[in-house]
């Protein structure tokens, strides 16, 4: 779980990941807007409302993910803030985080679990058993909503 001492490093890791991972998929304006929302304060707020996990290699944060209710529904949950540092992608970090999230009580009790996804993350989520909600839901910001029905 995330600790009070993690938030500054976590914010920087997420911002770096967005800048690098999204550069070939989204306009710079969208990337900068997304980065501007990854503040220490917002991450602390999420950590107070969700179960928020971090993956570390030694003392360095290399990934994160959170899970909570989907709009207050007890039988539906949602993954949030799922990021893996670019130089650690493809090395099992995302799978490790997903395994933690899928053992969490929010996941265990849910019949459906949703995950909003960026374009580059879709193949990972599909590999983990998630598929597009209602065929292929695309939001105005160019993101997708995937789901896993249990």
Q: What are the language-model segments listed below?
A:
Residues 15-41:
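Conserved GNAT-fold acetyl-CoA-binding loop/helix
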Residues 98, 105-118:
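Conserved GNAT acetyl-CoA-binding A-motif
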Residues 1-12:
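A short beta-loop-alpha structural element at the N-terminal edge
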Residues 38-54, 78:
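A short helix-loop-beta-strand connector motif used in the catalytic cores of GNAT acetyltransferases and
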Residues 54, 60-69, 78, 83:
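Conserved beta-strand in the GNAT
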Residues 114-116, 126, 131-147:
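Conserved catalytic-core motifs of GNAT/GCN5-like acyltransferases
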Residues 69-80, 89, 108, 139-142:
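A conserved beta-turn-beta hairpin within the catalytic core of GNAT-like acetyltransferases
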Residues 84, 90-103, 127:
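Conserved acetyl-CoA-binding loop-helix of GNAT-fold acetyltransferases
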